[in-house]
Amino acid sequence: MTAFGKKWLTGLVTGALMAVSAGSLAAEQKTLHVYNWSDYIAPDTVANFEKETGIKVVYDVFDSNEVLEGKLMAGSTGFDLVVPSASFLERQLAAGVFQPLDKSKLPNWKNLDPEVLKLVAKHDPENKYAMPYL
């Protein structure tokens, strides 16, 4: 695989992993706890999301896979949505740190490209925990 392909796949599988179903949590509690790479979203993304949905976002960032993994492996983090990289995803799944996605609460799941989901499945074999991000 080319360097571009690996980079693309890593970005792609930097899947939105749910510690709980963000959709149901947001609907019930109106707060979404996100743990993402620093500088992954535009400065106004959270504010725009909050304005559009009425859901408050608590947005925390990390700057390395090791920091993310240390927090996840330590136990209950309280995060609803976590954005790991593909290279650490399989190990985190094996450790049981994520809950399965509730696809009934992801109405656009059906619109995802099957070829892209096959790439994600290389790290999450049944597409139970991860979904494409980029």
Specify the residue positions occupied by each region the protein language model found:
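A generic structural signal for secondary-structure junctions
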Residues: 13, 73, 94-97, 102, ...
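Short aromatic-enriched loop/helix-cap "lid" or pocket-rim segments at secondary-structure transitions
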Residues: 46, 94-96, 114
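Bacterial N-terminal signal peptides
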Residues: 11-21
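Bacterial N-terminal signal peptides that target proteins for export
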Residues: 1-12
